[in-house]
Each structure stands twice: as C-alpha cells, then as structure tokens.
C-alpha cells in the first residue's frame, strides 16, 4: 500500500469515528443520592456563594434521580455552572430536561457550551420568573444577551431545552418549538459543555444529552 493511501485511510477512519461517536447522556441514575454527580466540575460566575449541585430523588417521585442546584443564595449577579470534565466540543447539540422549583430573585435554567472557564462561555437559558428564553455570551465575567424570545415558562413543570451549535450559528428549541436562531463569533474554539442557573434558582435537571460532531 502506498504511504499516502495509508495516511488517507487513517484520516478517514478518524473522521468516521468522530462523526459516529455515541451521544453522552447523563440521567444520574447511577449517582449517589445526596452527593455531587461523577464526571462534573463546578464553578460560579459573579458573586455570592458557590452553587450546591447534588443528586436527589425527583420532587414528588418515588425513585427517579435528578441533579439539583439547591443553593438559594439571593445574590443577583450569581451564576452557578456544572460542566462535564471530559469532552471538548465546537459543533454540538445539547438537550436537557429541567424543572424550576423556586426562586424569589430568579428562576432560570440553561445550557452552557464552548466553556473556557467560569468567566467565558455561551449560554442559553429559559426563565420562569421573566417568561422568556435568551442567548448570551459571557466574556471576562460580563454577560450580554444577543437574542431574546418571550414564552411561558411555568414553575414546577418539566421543560425540554435544546441547543444546536454549528459554527457561528446557534438554534434553540423550548418544549419542541424553535424559539431562537442567532449568529455570534465571540467564541470559535471548542470548549466544555454543561448546565447553568442564576441567583436563588432551585432547579432540577435530568437527561442531559451531548451529541458532538
């Protein structure tokens, strides 16, 4: 076999493996109740206390395990995040089920992608206090919205939030309906992915799925 042919086979095989990699799905059923889930790291953008991310039995259920951010610190500019330790993604589809339980300052839940550190990443979030979904970038710890859509986000109800990132193009679905379609070039390189809340938002998360390309 010619050297360049062998090289092409290696490259094609690698590309094929990346393209057909199975999605990562975390349903928290194998994690210990009362402890942080394995495979995540935790951080906080802004002030106030660190987030408290623990696995609990779903409120009102007998046995379904969920990830809960349960710290109710009232600091307004406070954004607890939980990101997967492994994996770095540029083009990716993220999906999560989330249920806002409480929050006087806010009731926001979101998805994070192209995460560099606690002060630099993209986020899309839906808010049961404001009844809207928004895309932001957080740069050097400062959050800026670049697209917003008003939609009902009932408290104590499960919702499905989905985000697809392809290059500089981001599409967001809320409960099966496309609500946001935006472009931004702030972060072009791959980064980590994860979950987000704000202020005193107490949120349950389940079935976090990461489908990279």
Give names to the regions the model predicted.
Residues 80-86, 147-153, 194-195:
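Beta-strand-rich interaction surfaces with strong enrichment in secreted/lumenal proteins
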């Amino acid at each position: 076999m010619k050297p360049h042919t062998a090289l092409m086979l290696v490259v094609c095989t690698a590309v094929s493996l990346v393209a057909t990699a199975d999605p990562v799905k975390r349903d928290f059923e194998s994690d210990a109740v009362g402890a942080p889930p394995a495979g995540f790291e935790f951080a906080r953008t802004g002030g106030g206390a660190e987030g408290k991310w623990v696995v609990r039995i779903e409120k009102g259920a007998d046995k379904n395990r969920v990830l809960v951010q349960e710290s109710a610190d009232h600091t307004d500019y406070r954004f607890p995040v939980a990101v997967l330790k492994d994996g770095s993604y540029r083009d990716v589809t993220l999906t999560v089920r989330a249920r806002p339980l409480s929050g006087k300052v806010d009731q926001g839940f979101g998805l994070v992608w192209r995460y560099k550190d606690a002060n630099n990443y993209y986020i899309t979030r839906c808010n049961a206090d404001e009844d809207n979904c928004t895309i932001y970038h957080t740069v050097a710890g400062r959050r800026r919205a670049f697209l917003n859509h008003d939609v009902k986000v009932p408290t104590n109800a499960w919702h499905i939030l989905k985000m697809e990132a392809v290059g500089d193009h981001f599409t967001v679905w809320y409960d099966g309906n496309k609500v946001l379609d935006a472009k931004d070039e702030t972060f072009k390189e791959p980064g980590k992915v994860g979950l987000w809340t704000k202020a005193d938002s107490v949120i349950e998360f389940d079935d976090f799925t990461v489908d990279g390309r």
